[in-house]
């Protein structure tokens, strides 16, 4: 019960700020937090979360009410190298960072909640 988003246009540190908010929470709580969060990364992470819920529902037949966010992996993706003009005919390199995100869901037991 996993979904991935490869090469999200943001750095790992920025994605981790949002990912820390949903780790270990129920799917409905995590989705509502992402829905009302005023960060640009909340929308793509919400889509990945709902994709993993759909994978759990369609592939494993699990009830979405019994799911929680077990793990959120945020890793370094590709980085584009660009160059900007500087004074005296020089140039400076600019790196545009990307991230890979993977959300793993677990099934709630009676003891967990």
Curated annotation (Swiss-Prot):
Q: Could you state a single Gene Ontology molecular function term?
A: structural constituent of ribosome
Keyword annotations: Ribonucleoprotein, Ribosomal protein, RNA-binding, rRNA-binding
Superkingdom of the source?
Bacteria
Is the keyword Lipid metabolism in the record?
Answer: no
**Complex formation:** Part of the 50S ribosomal subunit.
Q: Would you identify the family this protein belongs to, as annotated?
A: Belongs to the universal ribosomal protein uL22 family.
Designated name of the protein = Large ribosomal subunit protein uL22
Q: Gene for this protein? A: rplV
